[in-house]
C-alpha cells in the first residue's frame, strides 16, 4: 500500500480544510507523539520489527550519479549501510558500540575503525530503530511542541527533541496523517555544528508499519541533496550478527 503525502494533500481540497481544523486545535506533546505512533502502525507493530532490510538506490549530484544501496538494521542498535557502483562497494557499520567502514573510493580496501564523531550519524540511525519519538522519556530525551511551521506549503506540527548528549532534532509532522515529513538534526562533529535536513515521503505499509520509501537529505539550506529511493523493504529478515562485526585481519602468507 502506497501513501504519497504530497500528492494527497495537494489534490484533495477537503484535506486542506482538515489541516486548518487540526492546526487550530491546542495540542500537547504527548498527544502528538501518540498520534504519530498510531499513524506509523501502532506501538505493537513497531516493536514487532526485530530487523529491517531496505534495498534501493542513492542519487547524488542532483541525480547525475547513482549508487545501488542496501541498508540493514537489527535490534538493539546495529546498522549496516552498503553503496555500490561500478563493482566497488562502500560499507559503513555500527555494531552497537562503535563504527567502522570500508571505503574503496578513497583508495582503502581494508576495514578501518571510525572515531566517535564519525560514528555519530550511524549510532543515531541504529539507536533510533523505532523512531525518535518512541520511548523518548526512557531514552532520557526532552521533547517540546513548538507549534506549527510551513514545510513546502504544509502547515506542519514542529517538535523539538533534545538528546542527553546535546544533539537536537526537530521533527515536522503532517497535520492530517501525523507522519514525519521533515526532520532537522543538529549535532557537533569534530567541533563543527552540523544541521542536516531530511525530507520524507512516499510512505508504504510493510508488515503493518508505514515506512518512507523516498527521502532527500542534505545540509540545511543546500539545494544539493542526496535522494534515496527504496524499492524493497523486508521486515524481520534473518540477519547474522557477523555482518556487523569488524572483519578479522586476513592472514598473510
Task: Tell me the role of every PLM-derived stretch.
Residues 100-129:
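Acidic/charged, solvent-exposed loop-and-adjacent secondary-structure segments enriched in E/D, K/R, S/T
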Residues 24-25, 29-107, 140-147:
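N-terminal mature ectodomain segment of secretory-pathway/periplasmic proteins
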Residues 122-160, 179-182:
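Short, conserved active-site entrance elements at the starts or edges of catalytic domains
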Residues 88, 148, 152-249:
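Gly/Pro-enriched, hydrophobic low-complexity segments
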Residues 8-18:
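Bacterial N-terminal signal peptides
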Residues 49-51, 76, 138-140, 154-156, ...:
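Extracytoplasmic
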Residues 1-6:
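Positively charged n-region of N-terminal signal peptides that target proteins for export
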Residues 19-23:
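Sec/Tat signal peptide C-region and signal peptidase I cleavage site
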Amino acid at each position: 500500500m502506497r501513501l504519497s503525502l504530497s500528492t494527497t494533500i495537494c489534490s484533495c481540497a477537503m484535506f486542506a480544510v482538515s489541516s486548518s481544523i487540526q492546526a487550530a486545535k491546542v495540542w500537547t506533546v504527548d498527544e502528538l507523539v501518540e498520534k504519530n505512533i498510531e499513524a506509523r502502525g501502532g506501538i505493537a507493530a513497531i516493536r514487532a520489527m526485530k530487523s529491517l532490510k531496505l534495498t534501493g538506490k542513492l542519487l547524488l549530484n542532483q541525480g547525475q550519479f547513482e549508487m545501488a544501496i542496501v541498508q540493514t538494521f537489527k535490534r538493539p542498535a546495529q546498522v549496516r549501510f552498503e553503496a555500490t557502483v561500478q563493482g566497488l562497494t562502500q560499507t559503513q557499520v555500527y555494531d552497537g558500540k562503535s563504527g567502522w567502514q570500508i571505503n574503496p573510493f578513497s583508495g582503502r580496501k581494508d576495514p578501518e575503525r571510525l572515531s566517535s564523531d564519525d560514528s555519530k550519524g550511524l549510532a543515531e540511525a541504529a539507536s533510533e530503530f523505532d523512531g525518535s519519538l518512541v520511548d523518548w522519556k526512557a531514552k532520557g530525551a526532552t521533547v517540546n511542541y513548538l507549534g506549527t511551521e510551513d514545510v513546502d506549503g504544509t502547515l506542519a506540527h514542529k517538535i523539538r527533541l533534545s538528546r542527553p548528549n546535546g544533539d537536537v532534532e526537530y521533527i515536522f509532522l503532517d497535520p492530517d496523517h501525523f507522519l514525519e515529513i521533515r526532520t532537522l538534526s543538529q549535532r557537533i562533529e569534530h567541533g563543527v555544528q552540523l544541521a542536516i535536513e531530511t525530507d520524507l515521503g512516499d510512505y508504504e505499509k510493510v508488515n503493518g508499519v508505514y515506512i518512507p520509501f523516498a527521502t532527500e537529505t542534505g545540509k540545511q539550506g543546500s539545494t544539493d541533496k542526496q535522494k534515496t529511493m527504496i524499492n524493497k523493504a523486508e521486515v524481520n529478515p534473518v540477519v547474522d550478527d557477523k555482518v556487523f562485526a569488524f572483519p578479522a585481519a586476513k592472514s598473510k602468507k
